[in-house]
Design a protein with these regions (language model features):
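Ferredoxin-reductase
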Residues: 2-95, 99, 115, 151-153, ...
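Residue-level detector of beta-strand face positions
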Residues: 23, 43, 273-275, 318-320
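FNR/FR-type flavoprotein reductase catalytic core
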Residues: 84-268, 273-275, 282
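A structural signal for short secondary-structure junctions
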Residues: 210-211, 266-269, 299, 308-313
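Hydrophobic, well-ordered secondary-structure elements that form the walls
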Residues: 244, 298, 314-317
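C-terminal accessory/binding modules appended to enzymatic or scaffolding proteins
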Residues: 269-306, 322
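Local cysteine-cluster metal-coordination motifs and their immediate loop/turn environment
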Residues: 303-328
Length: 331
C-alpha cells in the first residue's frame, strides 16, 4: 500500500506565467521512504468532501543534488482543480499529502561510463528529462549530454535560468538547443517549430558529432511527439529500443478521441465477482464488463486501493493475467 505523508512546501516559485516550481521539505524520518531515482514522480493527494483526487508530478531535481527536498513543476490546466490550487493558492509552509516516489523513467549510471545522453522535451515535459540529464552529468564525468527543448516562446521556457547555469557549469559536456514554435527569436530557422522526426533529422545533420545510434534518449512531451520521434529513432536511425525511454504525461490517446477496440466491442455483458486482497484484507463486489472499471468500482465502494492517475499512465495499479483473456477498452 502507498502511504501518504504530509510534506511542507519549503519554496513556491512562479516559473512561467502558467507554471509553478514547488520544493517540498523531506523530514529526517521520511528520507529513507522518499529516496528517489532521477526521472521518478510524486503522487499528491487532495480530498474535497467525498472527492479523492490524486495527481502525479515528475521530480525535477537529481539524487546527486541531495535528499532534503523534492522539487516538482506544476503547469496550470484550465479547469484543473489541483493545478489551480498549486499554482494560485499554495504558499510556503503549507502542507500537502504525498506518497513515496515512483516510476521507471531512468537508466543506471556509473562513473566509468563514457556515453552520450539526448534529452528531447516539450513544455512541462522538461521535468523528468532534466532530472535524468543532471544525474548523468554528476555521476559520469566522461559522459556528454544534449538537450533539445521546445517551447512556444522565450518567456515560456521552463527552468531557463537553471538550464543556462548548467550549461556554464558543464560547458564542455552539455549542449542545449532551444526551439520556439510561436515566436521568431532566432535568426536560424532550424530553431523554429516543434520537435518532430523531421526536425530531429535536421538537428542531427547540424550536429554530426552526435553518435545517434549509440546514444541514450529521454523523451517527454505530447503523445504525438513521443510516437513520432521514437518511431523515427527506431525505424529510420536503427537505435535499439532499450536506448529509447519516454514518459507520457497523459494516456497516449485522449479518452474522448480514442476509438473503442473491436475486441472490447465484441465482449458480451458479463457479470463477474471481483475479489481484491488489500493489505491482507479481502473485499468482493460484483462488476459488469460494460460498466465501471475495477478501480472505479473499488473507489465507489470506498476501498483503500492504491491509485494515482486513473489514466493508464502512472503504473501505480497493475494487473497480471493468470487465466483467460483480457481486451483493452481503448488501446
Amino acid at each position: 500500500m502507498h502511504h501518504f505523508h504530509l510534506l511542507k512546501a519549503a519554496r513556491v516559485k512562479k516559473e512561467t506565467n502558467d507554471s509553478v516550481n514547488i520544493a517540498f521539505e523531506i523530514p529526517q524520518n521520511l528520507r529513507h521512504e522518499f529516496a528517489f531515482k532521477q526521472g521518478q514522480y510524486l503522487n499528491l493527494r487532495f480530498v474535497f468532501g467525498d472527492e479523492d483526487l490524486r495527481r502525479s508530478y515528475s521530480i525535477v531535481n537529481a539524487p546527486s543534488e541531495g535528499n532534503t527536498e523534492l522539487e516538482i513543476l506544476v503547469k496550470h490546466l484550465e479547469g484543473g482543480k489541483v493545478s489551480t490550487i498549486l499554482n494560485n493558492e499554495l504558499k510556503e509552509g503549507d502542507q500537502v499529502e504525498a506518497s513515496a516516489p515512483m516510476g521507471h523513467f531512468y537508466t543506471h549510471y556509473h562513473p566509468s561510463n563514457e556515453k552520450t545522453y539526448i534529452g528531447l522535451a516539450a513544455g512541462s515535459g522538461i521535468s523528468p528529462v532534466l532530472s535524468n540529464l543532471k544525474e548523468a552529468l554528476y555521476q559520469e564525468p566522461k559522459s556528454k549530454a544534449y538537450l533539445f527543448f521546445s517551447n512556444k516562446s522565450l518567456n515560456d521556457i521552463i527552468f531557463k535560468k537553471e538550464i543556462d547555469d548548467l550549461t556554464e557549469k558543464f560547458e564542455e559536456r552539455l549542449k542545449v538547443i532551444y526551439l520556439l514554435s510561436r515566436e521568431k527569436h532566432f535568426e536560424d530557422e532550424l530553431f523554429e517549430g516543434r520537435i518532430s522526426a523531421e526536425k530531429l533529422s535536421q538537428l542531427f545533420e547540424r550536429f554530426p558529432e552526435i553518435p545517434v545510434q549509440e546514444s541514450t534518449y529521454f523523451i517527454c512531451g505530447p503523445s504525438e511527439m513521443i510516437k513520432d520521434i521514437s518511431g523515427y529513432l527506431k525505424n529510420d536511425k536503427k537505435v535499439p529500443s532499450l536506448q529509447i525511454m519516454y514518459e507520457y504525461y497523459a494516456a497516449p490517446d485522449d479518452d474522448e478521441n480514442a476509438e473503442m477496440s473491436d475486441e472490447f466491442k465484441a465482449i458480451p455483458n458479463i457479470e463477474s465477482m471481483v475479489t481484491l486482497i488489500i493489505d491482507d484484507d479481502e473485499y468482493s463486489f460484483h462488476l459488469n464488463s460494460k460498466k465501471k472499471s475495477i478501480l472505479d468500482q473499488a473507489l465507489h465502494d470506498k476501498l483503500p486501493v492504491p491509485f494515482a492517475c486513473k489514466g493508464g499512465v502512472c503504473c501505480t495499479c497493475k494487473a497480471q493475467v493468470m487465466e483467460g483473456e483480457v481486451f483493452m477498452e481503448k488501446n
